[in-house]
Amino acid sequence: MEKIMKTLLPLSFLAIALASPALAQDEARAPDGSPAFGVEPYFGVMGGYHDFDSGNHGLLQTNGSAHGWLAGGYAGVNMPLGPVVVGAEANGAKGFQDIDWEYGVTGHVGLRAGDSGMIFARAGYQWIEGKRGFGNDRNEIYGMGVEVGPKDIGLGGLTTNAGVRLRLAVDTFDVFQSIRPSVGLTMHF
């Protein structure tokens, strides 16, 4: 038994020594080189157009249809979980025409796409301050969108792996009472 132990003990140490490099390998990575698991803060600027259906309540208790261009920004955090991404975001926008201000919060879930892109769906709560005879309103907001990085659209090498991404999104306020398409530039870091 002692002879077996004297043989197994050095072999055990040898096995541990040989396995150590495999255990010390880098963590899992996404296709763009960022960690597959972690926390990714971001911020961005956006522009869009918000158009309310004339049959809506809230902003549209008066006759007519509220609508207006928007310019704003957003900030949030993504938490990649392998191919799935979950996160939270705050937004704010200055409106023109019938909308004075919009601001809100959303949570989102998405799937990584391409080298550095993401397809996502989101839901949250939005406050809208109207003007020109349209009142204020607050309600749920739902939407979906896509983000694409430089490599995904043929501009590889333009920014670093975690750099600027183009965002295309569409949202609806109070379950299909409005439509809000938007375009944004998102900076991940």
Model-based region annotation:
Residues 4-24:
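Gram-negative bacterial Sec-dependent N-terminal signal peptides
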Residues 21-189:
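Gram-negative outer-membrane beta-barrel domains
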